[in-house]
A protein has these predicted regions:
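Protein-protein interaction/assembly regions in multi-subunit complexes
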Residues: 1-173
């Protein structure tokens, strides 16, 4: 189930920030916290090539995923996902590179030569399935009691239904 294709933020560029350990002018979070929050935003892509999303806001207060400029090819599954808190008189401008993929991809592999200076490559988890648990119970069919029933509990980010996740995983096998 961890090998199902999904989408993730693979690189970011924050206006006024030189590297991932820099503070963000006017924001409560530093760049590392902002990156962690962006990686938690659940996404679903309708294309199979990288896309760039833009977040630009000057509204003081909490910045949420709903502030990201909409793209017809990328669906933001939780518009209320928290990103940062912005102070009065500040502007937050973030570009995000979103790619489809499978499983975990390290920041080294997410580095693209075509990205200009200022982009920070990120490690990414593309799988829409977050966690799986299973139970095996005794089952009865007619008079026979020597059957077992498998119950799967699938936690996901909303990009795929539990039924589709299990179906896609079965196809991969």
């Amino acid at each position: 189930l961890s090998s199902i294709e999904g989408a993730a933020v693979t690189a970011v560029r924050v206006e006024g920030v030189l590297h991932e350990f820099s503070p963000i002018p006017g924001a409560m979070e530093d760049t590392t916290d902002l990156i962690l929050n962006l990686k938690r935003v659940p996404l679903k892509m309708h294309v199979d090539h990288p896309k760039t999303l833009l977040l630009r806001t000057s509204e003081p207060g909490e910045v949420r995923a709903k502030h990201i400029t909409p793209d017809p090819d990328i669906e933001i599954l939780d518009p209320e996902a928290y990103i940062a808190t912005l102070g009065a008189g500040s502007t937050l401008a973030v570009e995000m590179r979103v790619k489809p993929g499978r499983g975990y991809v390290s920041a080294d592999k997410n580095f693209d030569e075509d990205l200009s200076i200022g982009w920070i490559p990120l490690d990414s988890v593309h799988s829409p399935v977050k966690k799986v648990n299973y139970f095996v119970d005794q089952a009865r069919v007619g008079q026979a009691t020597d059957y077992e029933k498998l119950t799967l509990v699938v936690w996901r980010n909303g990009a795929v239904s539990p039924r589709d996740a299990v179906g896609l995983a079965a196809k991969l096998m």
